[in-house]
Amino acid sequence: MEYQIKYENGIANRGCLYRLKKVMDRAKAGEALNIAFLGGSITQGSLSSKPELCYAYHVYEWWKKTFPQADFTYINAGIGGTTSQFGVARAEADLLSKEPDFVIIEFSVNDDSTEHFMETYEGLVRKVYTSKTKPAVLLVHNVFYNNGANAQLMHGRIARYYNLPAVSMQSTIYPEVVAGRIENREITPDDLHPNDAGHALVASVDRKST
């Protein structure tokens, strides 16, 4: 089903796109590139019917289809039920050791909207952004579809401080649910984790709101 999402509303922070452009230029040149994802259960692919239908794999597939001359490797470092506090502790082993060139970070429904988690999220973002490969980083804010809650207010401060692009489901998909144009059970069985249709929708916001 095609949904009429206002993708322009999904830009939580425009940020500097210089690194993203550099990765795309390298892809056009046919280089080998690592496309990586770090987050919680949604990134892991929870409730997608198979791993290839989670939002992260959809984004990876977009890179492959858009730049067929390049050699891409998919790195999914999502672990369900984890926050950015655990994310920063495992970032080196699970993500940075694999030398990513493009990274999506997704913890806005795992972290609470508190100063503590703003600090742990900032530590994670800084660790990834300043790592050896200097990857392009995209911050993704998922949302609870029953009440619109997430940690975007706190996480958004970090996006602005580091001038990083960030996209939001709170301002794209959630308003459509509230308005009744999308039935929540069409995209999520539990008001949080997307089903296959929901994962595809999240991936479309990731791509089109950047």
Where are these regions (language model features)?
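Structural cue for short, hydrophobic secondary-structure segments
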Residues: F37-L38, E106
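Short hydrophobic segments within beta-strands
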Residues: L38-G39, V140
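Alpha-helical cap/lid subdomain in secreted, periplasmic
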Residues: E31, C54-I75, G80-T82, F86-K208
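A short, flexible beta-alpha/helix-coil linker loop
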Residues: S41-Q44, V109-D111
